[in-house]
């Protein structure tokens, strides 16, 4: 175990949109440290969003992330040999992390041809409160609601 808790690293805002959220999305998309490719993918999908919707892509992206963010999540707690899924509140930092993770992983599962199209369409869907990532949030909330009886078991 660590002596002290590791301090959070500051994420710098991206150069194009000057947004920390966009940088975090780029980092979520990035595979094997290839940040340049991840930037091309996200900025390209922002261009596609601008073409398709005729609106500011950053606004649509922020709305999409807000629609994906979960309020509750389930944590497994073992008590007397039984595992219980305990609903807990999600911290603001983790809300964003989960939203971006779900956005990227569920974008990768889509059936469009390129990653640009996949992410662009998932962001547009999420901003309209549809799509796989919003469904993931809804499923998480349903599970938390179903396990509300275990909420007294604090984490």
From Swiss-Prot:
HAMAP family: Ribosomal_uS7_B (MF_00480_B). Belongs to the universal ribosomal protein uS7 family. Part of the 30S ribosomal subunit. Contacts proteins S9 and S11. One of the primary rRNA binding proteins, it binds directly to 16S rRNA where it nucleates assembly of the head domain of the 30S subunit. Is located at the subunit interface close to the decoding center, probably blocks exit of the E-site tRNA. GO terms for molecular function: rRNA binding; structural constituent of ribosome; tRNA binding. One of its GO terms (cellular component) is small ribosomal subunit. The keyword Lyase does not apply. Keywords: Ribonucleoprotein, Ribosomal protein, RNA-binding, rRNA-binding, tRNA-binding. The keyword Nuclease does not apply. GO terms for biological process: translation. It comes from Mycoplasmoides gallisepticum (strain R(low / passage 15 / clone 2)). This is Small ribosomal subunit protein uS7. The gene is rpsG. SUPFAM superfamilies: Ribosomal protein S7.
